[in-house]
């Protein structure tokens, strides 16, 4: 299956997404720190990045821009509990494939990941 990076400032949120996607057969790398996640992306290819919008030092949108400059083919799903029109538009402008609102249902998460990985 796919290699997926998950970045959220909340450890439990990372673990929830990790557990759901590993059960679906994906290899998941979870991070709560932006620098660690970007360092991983620089050294390892991932198929998909799942990014929370609200992080510790930067926004998920800023991290998305950095990931796209490092590995343009990496697909991305943005997650947030605080959706705004601005972050939605900016996420899509920078190349996000999906923008989901938390809390997200496990089945919806699996379906969204499968669709994004297929290119839809």
PLM-predicted stretches and their roles:
Residues 104-113:
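C-terminal output helix
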């Amino acid at each position: 299956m796919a290699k997926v990076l998950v970045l959220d400032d909340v450890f439990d949120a990372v673990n929830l997404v990790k557990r759901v996607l590993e059960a679906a057969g994906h290899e998941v790398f979870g991070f709560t720190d932006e620098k660690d996640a970007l360092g991983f992306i620089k050294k390892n290819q991932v198929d998909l990045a799942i990014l929370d919008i609200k992080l510790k030092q930067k926004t998920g949108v800023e991290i998305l821009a950095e990931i796209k400059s490092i590995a343009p083919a990496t697909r991305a799903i943005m997650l947030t509990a605080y959706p705004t029109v601005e972050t939605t538009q900016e996420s899509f402008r920078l190349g996000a494939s999906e923008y989901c609102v938390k809390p997200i249902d496990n089945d919806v998460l699996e379906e969204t990941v499968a669709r994004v990985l297929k290119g839809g």
